[in-house]
Amino acid sequence: MSSNLTALPAGEACALETLIAPTPGGIASRILAKKGGGSVTLFAFDAGQGLTEHTSPFDALVVVLAGTLGVTIAGARVEAAPGTIVRLPAGVPHAVEARQPARMLLVMLRDAGAA
């Protein structure tokens, strides 16, 4: 994995809503940081959009910034509102659906020794 911590200006306070433009009827994403230990990606979803069910070999955290997300983990659904965080366990099927226009941070937690 390449070393990338330059997606954000150094030493500046950035408003998250200015870092990504929503896509009408779609999903927009922007990698904010990426290193061997993981990555941080900002997502903007239009209403009804989401990430279909999949698995990941690593744990991840969903941090809801705006809107409401339906998060399904191993068939169990939870509603996540702004200011909440949801852990997605490694190897467990999960999906995300925006009930309304929404933004989230996805923090991938890779093994520090992973390449």
Regions found by a protein language model. Give the residues of each.
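Short beta-strand His + acidic residue motifs that chelate non-heme Fe in jelly-roll/DSBH
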Residues: L51-E53, V71-T72, L88, P93-R99
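Structural motif
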Residues: S39, T68-G70, R77, P93, ...
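Short acidic-glycine-tyrosine-enriched beta hairpin
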Residues: G75-A90
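Conserved short histidine dyad/triad with adjacent acidic residue
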Residues: G25-G26, G36-S56
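A cytosolic small-molecule/anion-sensing beta-strand core signal
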Residues: L65-A66, A81-P82, Q100
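Short, conserved beta-strand element in jelly-roll/cupin
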Residues: A44-D46, S56-V71
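Ligand-binding loop in jelly-roll beta-barrel domains
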Residues: A90-A114
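A short, N-terminal "cap"/entry segment at the start of jelly-roll beta-barrel domains
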Residues: M1-G37
